[in-house]
A protein has these predicted regions:
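Helix-rich, typically C-terminal accessory recognition domains appended to large enzymatic cores
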Residues: 341-345, 350-364, 380-398
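Terminal accessory carbohydrate-recognition/targeting modules of carbohydrate-active enzymes
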Residues: 1-255, 280-283, 368-380, 384-385, ...
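Substrate-binding groove/exosite segments of carbohydrate-active enzymes
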Residues: 184-188, 232-349, 354-360
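A short hydrophobic/aromatic micro-motif that marks alpha-helical segments and, especially, helix-coil
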Residues: 128-129, 287, 359, 366
Length: 492
């Protein structure tokens, strides 16, 4: 959340918060953390942020230049560093479900890496377009309209509550916060705000939690730490396809995008990308939960079948309701293309007559594509298209081969394709690439593999093997990259 200063020195003219990183839990609780560590629970009208009183002055991450945020791994765990006099104050932010009946919350842990004590103000204010009509302090909690908005892990040293006639930042930074908890503040226009000011010794840390519902427990004792949450997300990706390419940034984006898709609003195209990247169970759950148009849901179901050929996904109470999907679409053209693909599924279910009807309805109609609609699906689709593009008779591997990738190793494991699960690797012998591949085909039909980004003359219909390709025409790998011999192995 960025703010402008007006000429009188009062610093607040609210502007809409930038889109940030979603964090959340399995029960549907979601919040957005922006690049300055401001947390907004989705569906609420308020945000929670923090300010730091250093030796020289107060610092607000939303307006300071020296703020750096990183996402160390695939998990939605963020580290935001604010430079203050003498060192950094570091905020680590994640979402977790508390022990017992605590429920879900966003947890923020602030670590004081400076050699001196600081004070931290944990502030609650209305978001742009939102309202806070009543705010009150209750010990370690701030309540918005009677519901817990934030809880700190220790007794505050000071409190500040304001209405529209006062500025919360001005009160806190000007020393106006008071020792005793003030009476609750009401504001008809929804501009009430408040802060808890907490001392933070040097080399120490504190936690606060932004809960989904009322919370009275101590955040430091109630929620798992960030490392445990990150390990949980890593376990969720154990079945996902993996890629290792010379572009390390792009390699890291794939698992992050898979996590982000599981926290995003369920969509049909999101379900397809989860399936393409090996997360079948999550794909089925996403497609079952989406409210996208019926035709898109049917098309997505057809793509899921093409990518995995798993009849169990369409059976039982936890499976996709095939009959409902088939009956619902108003767009008969899109439906026909999807039905043609699902005919094989109907055969597998022993519904030969329905399968024949589906093939007849789909005569001459191809399965529609579902274009990406957001950053995670765009990233995953772009990368999968580069790594394995469906051709008229098989798969084209490495359709794009940037010069920066030449000479670097490439590994792909467990990517789902319409022809089977695919894995391959590229190793280099000087300026010549060696390709190792394995395609676990869905059926016995031949699948032609090509590598147009490396050797346009190469093709094979063998399901597995290795081959030394020709040197890329007119392109020389960097001499600094050591050649490595092809090494066999499994890709799944």
């Amino acid at each position: 959340m960025f703010r402008f200063r007006n000429r009188s020195g009062s610093r607040r003219v609210p502007v809409p918060a930038a889109v940030g990183t979603r964090v959340g839990t399995d029960d549907g609780f979601r919040a957005v953390v922006d690049t300055r560590s401001v947390v907004q629970p989705l569906g609420s009208g308020h945000r929670v942020e923090w300010w730091v009183a250093g030796e020289d002055r107060w610092y607000d991450p939303s307006t300071e230049a020296a703020v750096r945020q990183v996402r160390p791994g695939a998990a939605p765990v963020l580290e935001t560093r604010l430079r203050v006099s003498g060192g950094d104050v570091v905020a680590t932010t994640w979402a977790a479900v508390g022990r017992g009946s605590t429920g879900p919350a966003v947890v923020v842990e602030l670590a004081n890496e400076t050699p001196v004590p600081v004070a931290v103000a944990v502030a609650v204010q209305a978001v742009s377009g939102g309202q806070v009509r009543r705010i009150s302090a209750d010990g370690r909690r701030l309540l918005v309209d009677g519901t817990t908005a934030v809880v700190v892990d220790r007794e505050p040293g000071r409190y500040a509550l304001v209405d529209a006639a006062q500025d919360l930042w001005a009160m806190v930074s000007g020393g106006g916060a008071q020792v005793e908890p003030p009476r609750s503040v009401r504001c008809r226009i929804g501009a009430a705000a408040g802060a808890l000011v907490v001392p933070l010794p040097h080399r120490a840390s504190l936690r606060f939690a932004i809960p989904a519902a009322d919370l009275v427990e101590n955040p430091s004792a109630s929620f798992p730490d960030a490392d445990r949450v990150a390990a949980g997300w890593t376990a969720r990706l154990v079945d996902a396809a993996t890629v290792d390419i010379p572009d390390g940034v792009l390699s890291a984006e794939a698992p992050r995008a898979l996590v982000d898709l599981q926290l995003a609003k369920p969509t049909a195209v999101g379900a397809v990308e989860l399936a393409r990247w090996g997360l079948g169970r999550q794909a089925v759950e996403t497609l079952a939960a989406t409210s996208d148009p019926a035709a898109e849901r049917l098309v997505a179901a057809a793509h899921l079948w093409r990518l995995h050929r798993n009849p169990a996904w369409f059976e039982g109470p936890s499976g996709l309701p095939l009959e409902d999907l088939v009956r619902a679409p108003a767009d008969r053209v899109e439906a026909a293309g999807a039905l043609g693909v699902l005919a094989d599924l109907l055969d597998a279910r022993g519904e030969a007559r329905s399968a024949a009807d589906a093939r007849e309805a789909a005569a001459g109609v191809a399965l529609a594509s579902l274009p990406p609609t957001d950053p995670p699906t765009t990233t995953l689709r772009y990368l999968s298209d580069c790594l394995a593009w469906e051709s008229i008779d098989g798969l084209d591997l490495l359709t794009e081969m940037p010069d920066a990738w030449l000479g670097g190793g490439i590994e792909v494991h467990g990517l789902a394709t319409p022809h089977g699960r695919l894995g391959y690797a590229v190793r280099w012998h000087g300026d010549r690439p060696a390709l190792l591949w394995e395609l676990d085909r869905w059926d016995g039909r031949p699948v032609v593999l090509r590598v147009p980004g490396l050797d346009t003359a190469f093709s094979t219909d063998e399901p597995s093997g290795e081959a030394l390709l020709a040197a890329p025409a007119g392109r020389v790998p960097p001499r600094s990259v050591a050649a490595s011999p092809p090494d066999g192995g499994e890709f799944f």
